[in-house]
Amino acid sequence: MDAERKKAEGTEKAVAEKGGRRRSAARDLCRIALFAAVIAVCAWISVPVGEIPVTLQTMGVCLAAAFLGWKRGTAAVAVYILLGLCGVPVFAGFTGGIAKLVLPTGGYIVGFLFTALIVGGASDAVGERIKNTWARAGILAAAMAVGITVCYAFGTGWFLALYRMSDRAMTLAGALSMCVVPYLLPDLVKIVAAVLIVSAMKKYVRK
């Protein structure tokens, strides 16, 4: 009888664990889809500035990574990018399609993945180990700044390469003046806003 009872208990435990894994996987998929949608909405909020509009995309990417961590945050960004490349109008200006990669903003799209990796990695590293709210906010803000800088690097490099391939004269200084300088202040504001949102809402989102 004891053996049968232990076997039954083991079976029940295995079934419960399997059900828990399924629920966890379903919850992860829902969160990934939700933040992919958040990034899309952020992309639609844009202000035309030269060839590269000011959008809230980077803030959406930072929020996804900060809330979900590097694995699921990067997955959310990847889903967003794949939807856009498949033609779903999730990019800035309600646009989509693989042709976006050969436009001046194509490098930023690739850079979003690395921004998510950096910010998500910092979020995972901080976890619950750092209790001080200001310290956590400072680490996240620094990670977002680094992540967006990496995105700048991809965007500027892509922009410069496209200009040179089209036989148009463009120096690195010129590319920086078009791809980075006009966006420094807006991105600083977005970092502050993202950190405030994460600090206020993190306790309601369990990883």
What do these predicted regions represent?
Residues 2-76:
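Hydrophobic transmembrane alpha-helices
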Residues 4-6, 10-19, 34, 41, ...:
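Short helix-perturbing small/polar motifs within transmembrane alpha-helices
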Residues 24-35, 57-61, 73, 104, ...:
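Residue-level signature of transmembrane alpha-helical entry/exit and packing/kink sites
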Residues 31-36, 90-94, 169-170:
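Short hydrophobic/aromatic-rich motifs at helix boundaries and adjacent loops
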Residues 34, 78-82, 106, 114, ...:
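Hydrophobic residues within alpha-helical transmembrane segments
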Residues 38, 42, 46, 64, ...:
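Alpha-helical membrane-inserting segments
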Residues 43-121:
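Alpha-helical membrane segments and adjacent membrane-interface helices in multi-pass membrane proteins
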Residues 94, 130-207:
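Membrane-embedded alpha-helical hairpins and interfacial helices in multi-pass inner-membrane proteins
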